[in-house]
Amino acid sequence: LKPLGYATGQFGKNHFGDKNKYLPTAHGFDEFFGNLYHLNAEEEPENVDYPPEADFPNFKNIFGPRGVLHTWATEEDDPTEHPRWGRVGKQRIEDTGPLTKKRMETADTEFVAAAQDFIKRAHDDDKPFFVWFNTTWMHFRVHPPEHVLGQAGRWQSFYHDVMVEHDKHVG
């Protein structure tokens, strides 16, 4: 779509790999903002049985999940080589921080806002656009914010409450 003049963005979860060469902005997207793993993998560093730094130095740096990334395709080739993630290449990569259990409460709201901003910028530039939006919600390990609880009605689980909120995100 880029050769046809489209602005292209992917927002939300992306499970195609966490190395730089697998990021959406290395494969035709102008912009990406999202997470790279299943939610249970994202919250592992918060688990009580996660290997402690004192006993396993650098375990998290070597094996832990990458943070929520915001990336942009560039014309310039960045030769920076990260020992774990590989060569940066023709993209700019910003790690916005880990997807913690607390952040999971509002991650989809962050992703919706970023997608809306992308659409607004494309519209303001009078440019056609393509957005690929993938929510994290409705997966196992959902952590809803307090204001979401109870909105599905009496006798419903928080999973149902999150489904109502998810519907608000996607229409």
Residue locations for each model-derived region?
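Formylglycine-dependent sulfatase
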Residues: L1-G171
